[in-house]
Amino acid sequence: MSKEKFQRIKPHINVGTIGHVDHGKTTLTAAITNVLAKKYGGIPKAFDQIDNAPEEKARGITINTSHVEYDTKIRHYAHVDCPGHADYVKNMITGAAQMDGAILVVAATDGPMPQTREHILLGRQVGVPYIVVFMNKCDMVDDEELLELVEIEIRELLSQYDFPGDEIPIIRGSALKALEKDPIWIQKIIDLSEHLDNYIPEPKRIIDQPFLLPIEDVFSISGRGTVVTGRIERGTVKVGEEIEIIGIKNTVKTTCTGVEMFRKLLDEGRAGENVGILLRGTKREDVERGQVLAKPGSIKPHTQFESEVYVLKKEEGGRHTPFFNGYKPQFYFRTTDVTGSVELQKGTEMVMPGDNVKMLVKLISPIAMDDGLRFAIREGGKTVGAGIVSKIIV
């Protein structure tokens, strides 16, 4: 069966749901696809279709990132439903990296919770530029004053992490009631879609820069070869173009023999799109998550760099104790962790939680990088710092 061509008519925007576990992120994702499919066409998705990876069933919490698509009046959205549970923050980092904007879901019954804060902080770290808030479960709160207090609390929390808390749209709704086809609550989902259209500007795609795609996953398709998936960070890739696989191992040249998006074939992939790229003559075991595909010669792998780092406070889920020269955490770049060691500046004996420091980092495996690349510092499965590459050394 030949695959249909993907129609590019409306501008394409990447969004995702973030927020505390059980506040209704997946229910909201289902409600959006159902309400908007009815209004603007598209395929509605049920809750359990979105909550669809095997681990999720066992624990009743979202682990993997689910992708859905929907149309609004003026745009086409690709939407990731991000994991809510603290154990899966690593996945959230990869999910949040794919957002032109995020929908922060906060249950009106609870108000902001620990993971609400953690996800806002992560959004700040991984560069989510815009947040729209959906205050969920408002059907369960009769007290208008309580709703206002929760709203104030959300705005203050956003401002604390340098988002414009006073300007951010907050929509009061009920995802479950909208799924149950209650017209009052359906309208709230439509309101949300209009706020997404109006508040999140169409991103300035870095389409003219050299092609770069951080690899998220690798598949082997019998008879066709190896496919890598990820979101194109910049530039474009056309079928037939030569590209390089960079980072972790030695740099290898290959050729793009196919581009797919949402199971439809494209002639080229563009910045901002989640795509699968078919690679000529590349074995499944030669490629891994954490590498990048890029235009030949446009980016190099490096292991040593100077960085500007913020070390999280204990209250933010960071370390409880200082660290010293030679500290060896994991450095999380784009889609993967790499172990590295830290060299502090002369005169800096130790780094306390809450400090902002310059440090030299030496990685055990090379990573494709430019100045300005952001990373998270992690240990024992939790984020303990956020940084940016200020100067590449080697």
UniProtKB/Swiss-Prot annotation:
Residues 174-176 are annotated as: G5. It catalyses: GTP + H2O = GDP + phosphate + H(+). Coiled coil: none annotated. One of its GO terms (molecular function) is GTPase activity. It comes from the Bacteria. Monomer. GTP hydrolase that promotes the GTP-dependent binding of aminoacyl-tRNA to the A-site of ribosomes during protein biosynthesis. This is Elongation factor Tu.
